[in-house]
Design a protein with these regions (language model features):
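Non-catalytic accessory segments flanking enzyme active sites
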Residues: 1-42, 67-70, 74-75, 116-119, ...
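Alpha/beta-hydrolase fold active-site loops
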Residues: 29, 48, 127
Length: 171
């Protein structure tokens, strides 16, 4: 429907730009970059960056609308989101690569995306944050205990203990 048409006509939304990033072991990681609305390639100001990690882990990101990504971009952040190993949509090998091994292949891919962000001309490499919910929160927790490259971190409804998750989960 076009229920929100009048509202959307008043807003300038960020459009995700598709990227492919090569992980250290040669795996290609599908990613998207959303710059603040109105920012052009001629803009010299470097913005804070936010690396978003999806839940699941067997979920996936794409070019669909994410309210929280638009809010962050509108606030002046460059938002980067990707589908590291463990994500759906790239075949069985990609999806099952982290089975019983969270924090290995997926972590390699997350680090590759972070390295991409540190080199991106629109992103201030000293102001990169990481965030995610559920499994994305787990990987955010993993990241901040395995590197100091992130200036900030937000975990939302995160998995912090796999044993307690098994005993208290709705699944």
């Amino acid at each position: 429907t076009h229920f929100n048409g009048p509202l959307l006509e008043q807003l300038e939304l960020s459009k995700p730009a598709e990227k492919w990033i090569t992980s250290d072991d040669g795996t290609r990681v599908h990613a998207w970059v959303m710059q603040p609305p109105g920012r052009t390639s001629r803009s010299r100001r470097r913005c804070p960056g936010v690396l978003q990690i999806h839940g699941g882990p067997h979920a996936l990101y794409g070019t669909t609308f994410f309210h929280e990504f638009q809010v962050l971009a509108a606030a002046g952040h460059v938002v980067v989101f990707s589908n590291p190993r463990g994500s759906k949509g790239y075949g069985e090998e990609h999806c099952t690569a982290i089975q019983g091994q969270w924090g290995v292949a997926d972590w390699t891919d997350v680090q590759a995306v972070a390295s991409f962000m540190e080199q991106h001309p629109a992103i201030d490499p000293h102001r990169i944050g990481i965030m995610g919910g559920s499994y994305g929160g787990y990987m955010t927790n993993w990241a901040i205990t395995h590197t100091d490259r992130f200036a900030a971190a937000i975990t939302d409804r995160c998995v912090a203990n796999l044993v307690s998750m098994a005993g208290s989960s709705d699944y």
